[in-house]
Design a protein with these regions (language model features):
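Switch/communication elements of ASCE P-loop NTPase nucleotide-binding domains
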Residues: 1-114
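RecA-like P-loop NTPase motor core
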Residues: 58, 71-72, 77-174
Length: 175
């Protein structure tokens, strides 16, 4: 654990120093780091291990990902969903003042930690509890509908409340 953590951190520093070259940076400079789909090169455990020290560095960071695992490591107010529409790509984000503290805590637990991959869905079907989740998914399957392929996720709201989920989904461009 500790040795691998140090190796990853040293690798980050070496890459940053190499990219900096001979350019002298201002003391308050925050370089921009672009990371494209890191989950394609790292095992999920290594991704989690590598992500923590990366967030400690004084950097601006833009990361593209298809990983629910990586999303679960990122505060929802830092997530920006890009949605391809017929004539443009729309950007949706909650932002730092998007939800009150209580709703933010509920969303962080219910979506970020337990259902991060639901942020990739185009549409959420909100149902009351676990039983309804099982029933709706099974009925759809028996009727030949493939929710995953259609970008539909069934989300139960009993634990988090309906209003915070609706508010969050609307702000993030999820129908």
């Amino acid at each position: 654990g500790g040795r691998m953590y140090r190796v990853i951190l040293l690798g980050f520093f070496a890459t940053l120093l190499q990219a900096k070259g001979t350019v002298r940076l201002d003391r308050d400079a925050r370089p921009l780091l672009l990371v494209e789909d890191p989950e394609t090169r790292l095992h999920p455990i290594m991704l989690s291990v590598a992500w923590h020290p990366l967030n400690l560095l004084p950097l601006q960071q833009i990361t593209t990902t298809n990983s629910g695992e990586l999303l679960s490591l990122t505060p929802v107010e830092h997530v920006c969903r890009l949605v391809r529409e017929s004539s443009r790509v729309a950007a949706w984000r909650l932002g730092p003042s998007g939800m009150n503290a209580d709703d933010g805590r509920r969303i962080a637990f219910h979506i970020r930690f337990n259902r991060a991959s639901s942020l990739f869905a185009r549409c959420w079907l909100l149902v009351e509890g676990e039983t309804e989740t099982w029933v709706i998914n099974e009925l759809a399957r028996q009727c030949g509908h493939h929710f995953d392929a259609a970008g539909i996720k069934v989300i139960e709201f009993a634990q988090s409340g309906l209003k915070p989920l609706i508010k969050f989904a609307r702000r993030m461009g999820i129908e």
